[in-house]
Amino acid sequence: MAPDRGRRRADRRVLTDRDRKTRDRPRRNYARWRALSLSLVYVVFALHILHWKITGKTLAPLELNEVMYTLELGVITAGFLFMCFLVFGTLFFGRFFCSWACHIMVLQDLCAWLLRRVGIRAKPIRSRLLLWVPPLTAFYMFVWPQIIRAWRNKGFPTFQMWTDAEGWASFVTDNFWRNLPTPWIIVLTFLVCGFAMVYLLGSRTFCVYVCPYGAVFSLADRLSPGRIRVDRDKCQQCGTCTEVCTTAVRVHEDVKRYGMVVNPACLKDLDCVSHCPQQALRYRFGWPALFKSDKGGGRFGLPYDFSIAEEALMSVVFLTVLLSFRGLYSRVPFLLSLALGVIVGVFCVTAARLMTRSEVSLSTLHLKRAGRLTLPGGAFRVFFAVLTAFVAHSAFVRYHEYTGLRQ
């Protein structure tokens, strides 16, 4: 027995020494590097505009929605090539673009950081049906036109490159704002998608419930060999990785079950890697996840926040708002109308709860307590009434625009 006890003590000593070396090894602060990378996105934007102002011509803005024009008309644009580059990069490395170079992510993370600075941690909502908005939007943008083309027996268009004479499709342009919304609409889009959604619905809800490009990247990510992987000998299942994940990925459950993060919602911001107390997580290459995440307990691994009836109400309101605001006065862009649809849908469910429940909250605001309406609750009711009237007016305008165009 004595030799066995001595061997066990020696094993404990070896493990303790290894753990001490792991603990004392300096950690990489990926958050600072990511903040720098995201900040450079807007620096590049400013330099792009400055180059146009100085020279009179510049590279056309890289708009990912130009993929639709390429698929429909065969016109190769800068935005199409950029999207191809991102998809192929995601196929190999994973979803790094979303958290390291997306201009909307800059605003979302900035808002979340500012809220934390004042002690506010907005709780992300968990919805079944809203999860379908990004993939269905991507299907509508990129796949549905091809189905219509096949139905009408039209062949795929010949690839071609246009000059600036057409006014919207050239690689180089003398009109930087040719396809972009007006500055006021851009500011409104940034405020709604980058700030309002974070405060009201939680961190990175635009990525989860709106972004169609994220749906494409998540599909490509399933095939990527580059993933967050775990050293099972070091992992103690403490849950720190899940706690620090701002995309609400259940990291500790994935790595326990699969040895890697298989959820395609993982944006590779590497917060879990830098915060792991045992340094058990690493970004490495290996077998792709494929569709392993579909075998788990849903996107969040937690109960959803809305009943089936509430989800149905939210879906109807979402579609109504989307159709009412998209293209309103030839100004409101598609992504902004999607975001507004999600927000107003949640507002509508909240308003319904005010009539049926004794305790109601929205983000950090307590709207109703012990059956009594609070001051924020009263303000919400007034705001919701005004918002409902505005949506109804917008729907009226869009209906007459649509019927007028058909005549």
Listing of model-derived features with the role each one plays in the protein:
Residues 255-267:
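Short linker/helix segments within small regulatory modules
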Residues 2-256, 274, 279-407:
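Non-ligating segments of multi-cofactor redox enzymes
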